Amino acid sequence: VRAVAVDARGRVLMVRHTYLKGWWLPGGGVDRSETTHAAVVRELREEAGLVARGAPRLISIHSNERFFPGDHVAVFRIDAFDVGERTSHGEIAEIGWFSPSALPDDVNRGCRARLAEIFDGSPIDPDW
């Protein structure tokens, strides 16, 4: 799952992991017996300390077959949240808020494509 959290100024939350290059949308795996909705809420809290208010809205689902056979990535948008404490320390090196039209150069390719689909109206690619 990946979270597209958008603040009141229209900026998108991105995270820089300690073990991956570049900026990513917050997210991760779905735990056993966990829904994708619950997973994205949990990941957002763990990685960024944001507590979703209301249900996240499913935007798209993408195959991640070339990197992980059988894997899919569900992308959710979250526009209402409270700021709390991060519960995952050591995994996230940096958190940043960026305008979708002024993203850093090193945003992950899949994340950049999802943001273009959401904010620029680019066609949705079925692959991550």
Task: Report each predicted region and the residues it spans.
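Conserved N-terminal beta-strand and adjoining loop/helix that marks the start
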Residues: V1-V12, I61
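Nudix hydrolase/Nudix homology domain
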Residues: K21-G22, G90-W128
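Conserved hydrophobic/aromatic beta-strand scaffold that supports enzyme active sites
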Residues: V4, M14, V75-R77, W97
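Active-site-adjacent beta-strand/loop module that shapes the phosphate/pyrophosphate-binding cleft
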Residues: H62-E85, C111-S122
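A short coil-to-beta-strand element that immediately follows conserved catalytic motifs
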Residues: V51-S60
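Conserved Nudix-box catalytic region and its N-terminal flanking loop in Nudix hydrolases
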Residues: D7, R11-E47
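Short loop segments at secondary-structure junctions
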Residues: D7-G10, I78-G84, P100-A102
